[in-house]
Amino acid sequence: MTEQMTLRGTLQGHGGWVTQIATTPQYPDMILSASRDKSLIVWRLTRDESSYGVPQKSLHGHGHFVSDVILSSDGQFALSGSWDHTLRLWDLSTGQTTRRFVGHTKDVLSVAFSADNRQIVSGSRDKTIKLWNTLGVCKYTIQDDCHTDWTSCVRFSPNTQNPIIVSSGWDRLVKVWNLTNCKLKTNHYGHTGYVNTVTVSPDGSLCASGGKDSQAMLWDLNEGKHLYTLDGAGDTINALCFSPNRYWLCVASGPSIKIWDLEGKVVVDELKPEVMGTTSKAPTCLSLAWSADGQTLFAGYTDKLIRVWQVSMVSR
């Protein structure tokens, strides 16, 4: 028996590119998505044949594209970042904004919560990284040793024994920051084009980065060194996502999602949207999120859809 992915359905509701998707173990029947239509949608997963889920709430307030969204660990709150230069904290029970985070001077491209949900980090086209508390107060702005071009992505490590932030930038660098003093710990060199995205493994030991050079690079966060590179994306990498319970890394580039088994460094499966007709161009995959149980992969695209794949066993 071997594992492969099967397309289960789509989620339709956004009026623009689906830029990010968030899931939570607390609510397995809910996901949250962000879009260039300036809104966020809370979805209730019905898993029906006709539609995999229905929009339950739309969150409105941002004045420009919503670039990123993350859920608090209890699933009660969402944090979003937007090209309107702000972050917003949302109470999902009411659908209202509880805090606006003002301070960035350009588009906010990325937001993240620390493991304990007490700290928030954001990255922006103003090239800075800001640390905030949940009251919306900016506690620190990282400017020394920061990216010399747009800060494209920021992520906390889930490992509380090693409190770090990882960031990527259009200056081709992946940077690791010591959270205790906000000082630079490591510069990771290797990418030959801008870096779009970075993601940290569930145990905090690894991080993966990708962008223009279509190489997924893996870095050891404990040792601060380059481990290996997964080649063959062929297109700009827009999203990366570790499986929560398998040694897999999903790499989205162009219309394709490659699922790499990191043990054997082999592609387990490649997922592509079905395209009607020969003239239509396949949509680009921009965002990826696994369900907490690692059985379902959600992917957001430039055709405004979220596609849903499920892990299934097949006999060889």
UniProtKB/Swiss-Prot annotation:
WD repeats lie at residues 4-46, 52-93, 94-135, 137-180, 181-221, 222-263, 264-312. SMART domains: WD40. One of its GO terms (cellular component) is ribosome. One of its GO terms (molecular function) is ribosome binding. The keyword Ribonucleoprotein applies. InterPro entries: G-protein_beta_WD-40_rep, RACK1-like, WD40/YVTN_repeat-like_dom_sf, WD40_repeat_CS, WD40_repeat_dom_sf, WD40_rpt. The keyword Repeat applies. Gene3D superfamilies: YVTN repeat-like/Quinoprotein amine dehydrogenase. Disulfide bonds: none annotated. Keywords: Repeat, Ribonucleoprotein, Ribosomal protein, WD repeat. Belongs to the WD repeat G protein beta family. Ribosomal protein RACK1 subfamily. PANTHER family: RECEPTOR FOR ACTIVATED PROTEIN KINASE C RACK1. This is Small ribosomal subunit protein RACK1. It comes from Biomphalaria glabrata.
